[in-house]
Amino acid sequence: MSSPATTITFFFFFTLSSFFYITSSLQNNNNNKHTATVNSLNIPSAAAEITLVNPKLPPRSLSLTSSKKFEGSSNLVHLRYHMGPVLSSSPINIYVIWYGQWSRPHKSLIRDFLNSISDAKAPSPSVSEWWRTASLYTDQTGSNVSRSVLIAGEYSDSKYSHGQHLTRLTIQEVIASAARSASFPVDHKNGMYLVLTSHDVTMQDFCRAVCGFHYFTFPSMVGYTMPYAWVGQSGKQCPEVCAYPFALPGYMGHGGPGELRPPNGETGVDGMVSVIGHELAEVVSNPLINAWYAGEDPTAPTEIGDLCEGLYGSGGGGGYIGQVMRDREGKTFNMNGKGGRKFLVQWIWNPNLKACSGPNSVD
């Protein structure tokens, strides 16, 4: 999402007449590479049978046979390199700041996603395979974004040291306080802060215009320059905006199949995971807002996550999330993570294909 302010793209511009549900068994599907078993996923037998699902397929005249046009493939997208750094040193150190009240299960879910980025053992399609697209981006020396990501430190600010309403400036004060209290190192070369606010914390423009954003710290406020990202937990404030498709806006009514079931049963946090993925991909490829982005205005760049917002699988785009998977419990996902976790994470722009791509592509 664009930095410093992430513009929310409402990716559900479609009529309810085209809002229909298709499920196809993998036994009859030619794309058997997505078949998962109990042993490979380490999940209960009740969730062993996986099906492919696309709850918002395009009209039949624009079917999956022409899916490339729904995956953002375009020679008109001018994503350019502006000579700035990318996070290429290994590992990329993430310093997580938990602001507000966070439960252990919610923290565990987000940690598992972050740890899945470097976990090559997860079955395909996996989070680590998704991150390979981010690692295609290079700096002027030819160094790629690192494939290794590490949670290098954590700090819990459960007492809301800067109140329960934050702005883009006070978020830097939160970072400064956390850096001092947790004794985070000044990690210029390969570090970043990830500020996560709980469901009862409001942020300037949250729900109205942003679900998350990234920028860099100001020396005058934090003491040095370092990239950071902020993402809010929308579960009680605006799940229909920031946790879509696990929650639907009211104007959609009841003409379609309804919201999708989140892979870990947590609408707000499962939705948050995709926003975190979006922001991380943009931080590493454009940490100081002078590396990879489209458009001429660095104060409102279109970045590698923005170009694919709302796209989760093949056949998607133009208002459709694409073909994703569903287990027997009805939970939807498009990639596997560490320890049998499953996630639904948006695709990102592939500079080689000049299209959005993800590990669950069936083309």
From Swiss-Prot:
InterPro entries given in the database record: EXORDIUM-like (IPR006766)
Do you know what upregulates this one? By brassinolide.
Where found, per UniProt?
Secreted; Secreted, Extracellular space; Secreted, Extracellular space, Apoplast
Give the matching Pfam families.
Phi_1
Provide GO CC annotations from the record.
Answer: apoplast
Glycosylated residues are N144
Q: What are the alphabetically sorted keywords of the record?
A: Apoplast, Glycoprotein, Secreted, Signal
Signal peptide positions are 1-25
What family classification does the UniProt entry report for this protein? Belongs to the EXORDIUM family.
* Main function: May play a role in a brassinosteroid-dependent regulation of growth and development.
The UniProt entry, under PANTHER family, shows: PROTEIN EXORDIUM-LIKE 5
Query: Could you identify this protein by its name?
Result: Protein EXORDIUM-like 5
Q: What is the lineage of its organism?
A: Eukaryota, Viridiplantae, Streptophyta, Embryophyta, Tracheophyta
